[in-house]
């Protein structure tokens, strides 16, 4: 069983964030250690997934149903998912979400699916991690400094962000940068 800790779903309630800002926020939370896993989304989930995967230290999957959730964690062992909040979320959406979260955190991440494919899947995951380490090697703080600072400030302007972020942050360099955004 994976211990879950809710860092704060209220971090971005005050203002509506774009999926790009959600990507910035997710990258800050994951790279700083303030969160172990991020759940986000947008209308289709695609934009949010692309935004999150634009940052180092983030591996986001697009999850539409429980089997997506289970296979993403077992095969790809990522640290974020993007859900489609508009597309296909009509009747039974609450059931779909319940089952997604049940399957998302079922079993040990990276355990493979089907189980007999665990060795090649883990090998491919290590290869992917190596490719991402090369293609996304820039330091997160340096990436954030090169972005439009108003965009970054907007991503961390949520009412509860500072309280929850600084209470859980484990990376001093990221914490110092976030302080400059006040």
Placement of each model-derived feature along the sequence:
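Single conserved hydrophobic/aromatic residue that forms the stacking wall/gate
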Residues: 1-8, 12
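N-terminal beta-loop-helix "entrance" segment that forms/cooperates
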Residues: 10-25
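Short Gly/Thr/Asp-enriched flexible loops that form oxyanion-binding sites at enzyme active sites
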Residues: 47-60, 64-65
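A short, small-residue-rich loop immediately preceding and capping a beta-strand
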Residues: 35-41, 60
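C-terminal binding/interaction regions
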Residues: 70-176, 180-181
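Gly/Ser/Thr-rich loops at beta-strand to alpha-helix junctions
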Residues: 42-47, 88-89
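Short, well-structured alpha-helical segments in soluble
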Residues: 24-34
